[in-house]
Amino acid sequence: PRERARFQGYLAAVAVCANTFGPVAGGLLTELFGWRSIFLINVPIALLGALLTWRLPTHTTERVAWQPDPAGLVLFTVFVVSTLLALEQTQRVALNALPLAGGLFALGIVALVLLIRQETRAPSPLIPVALLRRPAIWRSDALAACHGAALVSLITFVPIYLQVVRGESPASTGLLLVPLTVGIGTGSLLTGRLVSRTGRTTVFPVFGLAVVTIDLLVLAFWASGLGTSALAGLLLWHGLFLGTVMGVVQVTVQSASGPLRLGEAAASVQFSRSIGAAFGTAIVATVLFAVLSARNPEAAHSFASMMEYGRQLGPTLPPAEQAAIQADIAAAFRAAFLAMAAFTTAGFFLALTNPLRRI
């Protein structure tokens, strides 16, 4: 299991660096070749991925009886789609959007209740309920969800913050995210080696997420006073400690599940991380637009225009009004960074209370 930790560190470094490198490459491609290039570049990457997958060595495992779970799949889809649409409706903070948002939330709750009931009865459930009853596994999966929420919302909204609030170009925004990518890769590799040597697991995300939470508080309250170099250094530091999580989560659930359910356990981590990323980004966007609309509806419209057309094509306003709108947008991003800090704080407590502390 300890050697597995080292290789999980490699995998986590590659996977998370790929996630954070996307905005870096996207900014440069948009600046040089236009926004269409960020979609076209995925074609050769997908073909390369398919080729590498085809060349993987085959590994035969013991076959187990399996039955599809179409009811679980439908209920899960209804739950996720309705809840995300409800969060999107709440971003408008308009009275005419509230009935639809409330109805979608209610539909999501009903679908969730029915989903839990279905998964406890299905012979081959979409969601491995039996595994999730184990404290070490459900806490690790919840930690993966919090990590996904914090990381993906960060790499989604930091580029917007840099361009809209600080006036950076897409290319310079991409370059400012390079330290975050380097930090995450380095943190994942170092954590994998430390777990392999010491056998300790949760101590690393406990310490790492505490530091990340402090970093997010610095971004929330003092980012406007940071120069470009200081901000790049903060993102490097932030990434270094964000890299302490995913490798530990994977090796923890694999150790807790046993060899027969190793695949289910590993899949549950990626599943949880993806769900956390989707919901986390939607929640942060809801907080951002809610605060902005509450402070200044005109600023919300201006921000939406900046998001759609770019900073240079926003509405022409007197300098004093532009400064006021910029201040309101900066305040909304403060709330967004605090929402991200809430995710990392929850992850900190999940890691702290995980019963599997050594492997």
Question: Where are the language model's segments positioned?
Answer:
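A membrane-interface helix-boundary motif in multi-pass transporters
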Residues: E31-I41, Q89-L100, S169, A290-A341
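Hydrophobic transmembrane-helix bundles of small-molecule transporters
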Residues: E31-L143, A150, E168-S169
